[in-house]
Amino acid sequence: MGKIPIKRILAIDYGKKRTGLAKTDPFCSFAQPVGTFPPEKIITIIKSFLQENSVEKIIVGYPLNSDGTKNPMTGIIDGFIEELSAAFPDIPVEPIDEHGSSKQAGKVLIESGLSRKKRQRKGRLDSAAACLLLQHYLENTGNA
């Protein structure tokens, strides 16, 4: 009997300085951090990730203002989504509203009991934000 391929969802919290990645567990039930990486290396990092993991979808945090309008970062993300779609044409890329995800991730890190010094490592915040984006996505699509 053949092995059933396990497909994951990959979430990206793209930033100018750091980009957080998160993935689902093998059953697409909950989010797990992958790490934080320099944005200029993220396509290479994802290619490496895909060599070891089957991904059915990539979701990207999409920065909108609280009133739903676009902001300067939205254009950067639009370009990044085009780059992702070109690099991985067989994997759908879906933008999802990320409004407040970094702020919420900061609160989660505080509640987790991490010391202020450890919380201030920005990489933790970016990967936590990617996890929150993904968990929110899973809950809203009925996967969690």
From Swiss-Prot:
This is Putative pre-16S rRNA nuclease. Its EC number is 3.1.-.-. It is an enzyme of class 3 (hydrolase). The keyword Cytoplasm applies. InterPro entries: RNaseH-like_sf, YqgF, YqgF/RNaseH-like_dom, YqgF/RNaseH-like_dom_sf. Could be a nuclease involved in processing of the 5'-end of pre-16S rRNA. One of its GO terms (molecular function) is nuclease activity. Pfam families: RuvX (PF03652). GO terms for cellular component: cytosol. One of its GO terms (biological process) is rRNA 5'-end processing. Keywords: Cytoplasm, Hydrolase, Nuclease, Ribosome biogenesis. The lineage of its organism: Bacteria, Pseudomonadati, Chlorobiota, Chlorobiia, Chlorobiales. Belongs to the YqgF nuclease family.
